[in-house]
Curated annotation (Swiss-Prot):
It comes from Gossypium hirsutum (Upland cotton). This is Large ribosomal subunit protein bL33c. Belongs to the bacterial ribosomal protein bL33 family. The keyword Cell membrane does not apply. One of its GO terms (cellular component) is ribonucleoprotein complex. SUPFAM superfamilies: Zn-binding ribosomal proteins (SSF57829). GO terms for biological process: translation. It is found in: Plastid, Chloroplast. Gene3D superfamilies: Ribosomal protein L33. Its main location: plastid. The gene is rpl33.
Length: 66
């Protein structure tokens, strides 16, 4: 039988450089990715290096709260 609490949760990854710059004049928005993580394997906040179409480079995307 499956447990009532799901192990995999849906998370949102947001570009840290776009947020830090306060959406400067060069970028027109904030890049966000939707993915899943296993709560048992990675209990801490997830950070991945992904491509940001607003910064035009690979940046660190951190997990945010919904």
């Amino acid at each position: 039988m499956a447990k009532s609490k799901d192990v995999r949760v849906t998370i949102i990854l947001e570009c840290t450089s776009c947020v830090r710059n306060g959406v400067n004049k060069e970028s027109t928005g904030i890049s966000r990715y939707i993915t899943q993580k296993n709560r048992h394997n990675t209990p801490s906040r997830l950070e991945l290096k992904k491509f940001c179409p607003y910064c035009y480079k690979h940046t660190i995307h951190g997990e945010i709260k919904k």
